[in-house]
Amino acid sequence: MLTAEDKKLIQQVWDKLQGCQEEVGAETLQRMFTTYPQTKTYFPHFDLSPGSDQIRGHGKKVVAALGTAVKSLDNLSQALSELSNLHAYNLRVDPVNFKLLAQCLQVVLATHMTKDYTPEIHAAFDKFLSAVAAVLAEKYR
C-alpha cells in the first residue's frame, strides 16, 4: 500500500524524468537484456544492439505505461488492465520478468538521479514497481 508520502515522492521522480523518458526506458531495457539475457527470448524480432530504434521505441512504451500508472496510483488495476491482458494472454510473458525490469529501472533511476535518489525515494519506487508488477501478473491466476 502506497502512503501519501510515497505517492508524493513517486510523482516528484516522475516529474524529473520529463524529457528523458525514452532514454531511461531504453537504458532500462538494455540493462535487463545484459543482466538477464533470458529476457531476450520475448524479443526475437528486435535489433537488440544498444541504442537500436526498436529498443528505444519499446523503452518509450514501457515508460509511457509507467506514466499511466503514476497518474493512477489509486487505481492501478484499472489503469493497467489492457497491458495486463496483453502480457498474460497474447505475449505470455513470465511474470518474474516484471520484477527483473523493475530492478533494472531502479538502477537506471539511481544512476540518473545520483544523490537525489534517496533511500526514501528508492523505497517508495520499490513499493510502486512491486504494485505494478503485481497488477500485471493478476491475469495469470
UniProtKB/Swiss-Prot annotation:
Bilayer-crossing regions: none
Family indicated by similarity: Belongs to the globin family.
Designated name of the protein: Hemoglobin subunit alpha-D
Nucleotide-binding keyword on record: no
Tissue-specific expression: Red blood cells.
PROSITE patterns from the UniProt entry: GLOBIN (PS01033)
Keyword line: Heme, Iron, Metal-binding, Oxygen transport, Transport
Binding site for heme b: H58, H87
Assembly information from the UniProt record: Heterotetramer of two alpha-D chains and two beta chains.
Iron found in the keyword field: yes
Role played: Involved in oxygen transport from the lung to the various peripheral tissues.
GO cellular component: blood microparticle; haptoglobin-hemoglobin complex; hemoglobin complex
Gene Ontology MF annotations: haptoglobin binding; heme binding; metal ion binding; organic acid binding; oxygen binding; oxygen carrier activity; peroxidase activity
Gene Ontology terms: biological process: hydrogen peroxide catabolic process
Source species, domain of life: Eukaryota
Domain Globin: 1-141
